[in-house]
Amino acid sequence: MLKEYEDSLYNASLVDGRVELLYIDEEPEVEEEAVIVEVEPAADSVATPTDADAVAKLMNGERADLVFTDPPYGMNLDTDYSSMQSKLAIADEKHLKGGNKYDAGHVDDFTPDMVQAVLNLDAKETFIWGADYFAELIPNRNDGSFIVWDKRANESGTIEQDESSDKMFGSCFELCWSKAKHKRDIARVKWAGIFGMEQEPDRKRVHPTQKPIALVAWFLNRYGKEGDIVVDLFGGSGSTMIACEQLGRKCRMMELDPHYCTVIIARWEKLTGQKAIKLNP
């Protein structure tokens, strides 16, 4: 099932200002049933975010301080890798289907109840990626603000002209909606799109819309504090959990797809050297 990751899964995390590669050398066993896994001080759940009981079980009576999430809009992408096959050895065929072009606006798989599930957490700070594609689904969206992620610039603001994949696939920036009315800001985190971060080797990624851990760290450091309970109801690649582990936050994460929930757990285990504990559903 995880044949796409036969060489090893990876991501980069920010450790003392440097990038550390995280490798997963073996294929983890996929958990098909809904479970909650304790990866102290975090929790990872295979369940749907629209199930209020499942979310309540995940939170275990605690309240979210900050929500950072990237909902599954556009997962049925219409994508053609034919011109880049020499660079893209293997695509995640489960979620990236062959076609003509990348269509980030394809949001058939995203529904209003998913947005409401995030807002129901009632966190002081809530950040939702891709909301510019489904803004009409967000109630009172004008009460919030948008933050720009500039993928081409480093922290000093210098734009580096290179051959990053986002010149061919996707865009050089993304927008994140904030529930709070923050001042206009730009997260400058260098990213080479589908090929990974500049510091990473040209390897396969673990998720089609994966966010770099350095980007998650940018938000957690600016809008949160150590010890915060951070919630991500659409865990995806698990970058939010890894950033929380690095920065002393408590993560509560949910992922609908058992495949990616397994990847998240494997990444956490590789980073910490600890073993996740499966709790009763």
Tell where the protein language model's regions lie, with residue ranges.
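SAM-dependent nucleic-acid methyltransferase catalytic core
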Residues: 1-8, 13-68, 278-281
